[in-house]
Amino acid sequence: MKKPLITLAVASALLSSPFSTVADTLIHAGKVFTGTSNSLQENVTIVVEDNKIKAVKKGFAEAQEGDTVIDLKTSTVMPGLMDMHVHLSSQHGGPQTYLERFSLNEADYALRAANYAKITLDSGFTTVRNLGDGYNETVALRNAISKGYATG
């Protein structure tokens, strides 16, 4: 009976100790536009945990063991942008986009949408509203991004 209680006590102590904390990502930013005011904040640390912003602190915080530091001290950081009118499966198309309806299949459109989602993300847009596709490829892409199978 004593062994399970000791094991439980040790496990509880470890789970509540600083050694069990999840490592954070610290972004040291020279300037930050938060969108909550018209002014820029200077020399701040953005604390990210589980891919979500946990805090924005004044000054450059020191990293704890296991933390990742991204040095953007010479950069301006801002929230991700939203594009409320995209066509991920036919973005950047010209007149040939209409002719491709006869030669491309569902998989072609899905791969194209994945490529455009990555380009859109790299351009600073973290949220988009897709306004239609022919084969539900953007629904499949959304699901793949959510599961970590694709970048977007």
Regions of interest found by a model, annotated:
Residues 1-8:
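Bacterial N-terminal signal peptides that target proteins for export
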Residues 11-12:
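Repetitive helical segments and hydrophobic/amphipathic motifs
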Residues 17-18:
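N-terminal signal peptide c-region/cleavage motif recognized by signal peptidases
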Residues 21-23:
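Boundary at the C-terminal end of the N-terminal hydrophobic targeting segment
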Residues 32, 36-78:
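Histidine-rich, glycine-flanked metal-binding segment
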Residues 65, 151-152:
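Short acidic capping loops at alpha-helix termini that bridge into adjacent secondary structure
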Residues 76-144, 149:
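Metal-associated gating/positioning segment near the N- to mid-region
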